[in-house]
């Protein structure tokens, strides 16, 4: 192929799919392959990915393993949580929010090496292909993207494993003796798809859950923690200042211990089909509850309701791969403006799969006890004022009722 790329940067996990892609790129395109492996806090030792890349013929200087945990939480997770973003009412977007960061580094490494293409291991059925590619094109309109799943004839897991065996590519086995697939993990969440999960009528087996204890097996006594915020971002746990990634790591441990953040969800993919996944987002679930708790006393009602109204659109943009779009950045500016006074501390109760706000306080609080008290408010609020307020708001309803009565 005359227009075939000479150098390709591959988003490489060291797993089955991307190891096969690495070999396929070498044989199909005859190109030099550069690998990028992101340490997103997935909890795996990444040195095996380096070793496997070298085993497959990648030069040491072309292997990039980058710790992006702080960048991930600071620049992607935290901005998203300022919006309380949830897709279709349930999904905390753990996979979606990692893709633009990976694409960013793919493009940067491509520029560093003078590569003319990037490649990913997302299938032609899922959302990730869209997320990777929209992000890459937004960052470099001239970049070429190779998506092997849309090109090759290895259209099933069986064919992939056969290809791996024919090319001496090591295949990891999970504890049930099966080749693992469709598991995505990072500091925010773990997702599992396929295998025993494809029939949405069947309850997911216990072995699918990798990150949290079963709520039934969680401690029989509740635990209380305090999370402090500055301008919408978590900055401390129990009074101890921590970095963004360290905060999420600590919250993950609290959530793991108490069985918090499990979700069995059938979602609507951007490409049009429904898919079923098991999501575990222990720390993120705690963080979301805490952020909502501090907003309750620091966010003006009009600003809060407006923010709530745009959240579904904001979440949809992230889910569909439009992190780098003008409209997401516009919404982000509005959301960030809303967080100027979202500073304070929330006390949370963790117990058997649940997380509940039980206290919140802030120097920026809009909560006025003297106005809402059931006792004597010492003149802070004149209840007679409510009569005029109600009359004005009832005016249009009366006019409509009178009009309708004339046409009965």
Curated annotation (Swiss-Prot):
Keyword RNA-binding: no
Compartment(s) of residence: Cytoplasm
Record's keyword annotation contains Lyase: no
Residues that, per the record, bind L-citrulline: 91, 96, 127, 131, 182, 191, 267, 279
GO MF entries: argininosuccinate synthase activity; ATP binding
Catalytic activity: L-citrulline + L-aspartate + ATP = 2-(N(omega)-L-arginino)succinate + AMP + diphosphate + H(+)
GO cellular component terms attached to this protein's record: cytoplasm
Source domain of life: Bacteria
Listed GO biological process terms: argininosuccinate metabolic process; L-arginine biosynthetic process; urea cycle
Keywords for this protein: Amino-acid biosynthesis, Arginine biosynthesis, ATP-binding, Cytoplasm, Ligase, Nucleotide-binding
InterPro entries reported for this sequence: Arginosuc_syn_C, Arginosuc_syn_N, Arginosuc_synth, Arginosuc_synth_CS, Arginosuc_synth_type_1_subfam, AS_cat/multimer_dom_body, Rossmann-like_a/b/a_fold
The EC number(s) this enzyme carries: 6.3.4.5
Enzyme class: ligase
One protein family per Pfam: Arginosuc_syn_C
Pathway terms, separated by semicolons: Amino-acid biosynthesis; L-arginine biosynthesis; L-arginine from L-ornithine and carbamoyl phosphate: step 2/3
Binding site for L-aspartate: 123, 127-128
Record-listed ATP binding positions: 11-19, 38, 121
HAMAP family: Arg_succ_synth_type1 (MF_00005)
Assembly, per entry: Homotetramer.
Family listed: Belongs to the argininosuccinate synthase family. Type 1 subfamily.
Protein name: Argininosuccinate synthase
